[in-house]
Regions:
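Intrinsic low-complexity, intrinsically disordered segments enriched in polar/basic residues
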Residues: 33-37, 229, 279
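Metal-dependent phosphoesterase core characteristic of DEDDh/y 3'-5' exonuclease domains
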Residues: 2-4, 65-89, 107-208, 212-241, ...
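C-terminal accessory extensions appended to soluble enzyme cores
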Residues: 235-282
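Generic structural signal of hydrophobic/aromatic residues within well-ordered alpha-helices
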Residues: 19, 42-46, 99, 177-178, ...
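N-terminal intrinsically disordered, low-complexity tails enriched in polar/charged
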Residues: 1-6, 278-282
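Conserved non-catalytic scaffold segment of RNase H-like nuclease domains
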Residues: 2-125
Length: 282
């Protein structure tokens, strides 16, 4: 069993260079100025609009995304919060390489929300672009227990899969699910704003948003582990307190800190009666 749990999230935007290879010529021309320079933001927006017309949704297929941020909550093997941070890197290549190196060196248990349906396949496609390697991630020496096994959560858990009973139901957006369960959800920035923030040169705002998503996902993970009997009340409350203490001390300038600390305080207060259950756990 791994010594760490890594709850991660990726933020992406359209890969304009990849779009150039596939978009109709008239669309490319409409994003090109009189000097022949292509406006990558305009091209990306046009591609999203074209996707909306064709499919009803503006979200592009996985192979047209590039990574701008990967954030993660690191917890111990029992789920106790250690820290939240963003993977360093001067560009996409370095960010992905550092994330894959972390998996290679520490073999963490990976937890995500729709990671199996988007983040992980997208990351591996982008890794191939840079000829990166991820042998530990693809290790299948244990056929039924590895990073890519869908129905075993020992090494990787996609919370969307598990909470939806493996997609038996739809419509479980992370934002609305978390808000319904008393967490902050997406209180400030939404995923469709990442493109605007990137071209407005606001990487810090993207980082804040990505970290807040991982905090929501981590808290959802705690609730799910509590639900299925993998975690007791004492561990649940102490993990929330550790998260609140860390972000209050180390992430005070982040816009997500106040909403999360307030929600955690309310959660502990509202469910204080469960502390009586702690005696039965011991």
């Amino acid at each position: 069993m791994s010594e760490y749990i890594c709850v991660f999230d990726c933020e992406t935007l359209p890969d304009a260079k990849a779009l150039l290879r596939t978009l109709p010529e008239d669309l490319v021309k409409s994003a090109t100025d009189k000097n022949g320079k292509i406006d990558e933001k305009a091209l990306s927006l046009l591609a999203c609009e074209e996707q909306r017309k064709n499919s009803g949704q503006a979200f592009l297929p996985v192979l047209f995304h590039k990574v701008v941020c990967i954030s993660a909550v690191l917890a111990d093997k029992n789920g106790k919060f250690i820290k939240v941070n963003t993977i360093e890197g001067k560009d996409e290549h370095e960010i992905i390489a550092n994330f894959l190196n972390f998996i290679e060196n520490h073999a963490p248990r990976l937890v995500s929300y729709n990671g199996r349906g988007f983040d992980l396949p997208m990351l591996m496609i982008r890794a191939m672009k840079y000829n990166l390697r991820a042998p530990r991630y693809y290790n299948t020496s244990d056929k039924w227990c590895n990073y890519r096994t869908r129905y075993d959560a020992t090494w990787a858990m996609d919370l969307l899969d598990y909470i939806s009973d493996f997609r038996a139901v739809s419509g479980l957006r992370l934002d609305t699910l978390c808000a319904m369960l008393g967490m902050p959800g997406k209180y400030d920035v939404h995923g469709d704003q990442v493109l605007e923030l990137f071209y407005a040169n606001k990487p810090q705002k993207i980082k804040e948003y990505c970290e807040s998503d991982t905090l929501n996902t981590y808290w959802l993970f705690l609730k799910y582990e509590l639900l299925r009997g993998k975690m007791g009340y004492e561990q649940y409350f102490s993990s929330l307190e550790a998260m609140s203490e860390f972000i209050a001390s180390n992430k005070a300038a982040m816009s997500y800190t106040k909403p999360f600390c307030e929600c955690i305080e309310k959660e502990i207060k509202d469910f204080s009666y469960l502390k009586n259950e702690l005696k039965t756990e011991k």
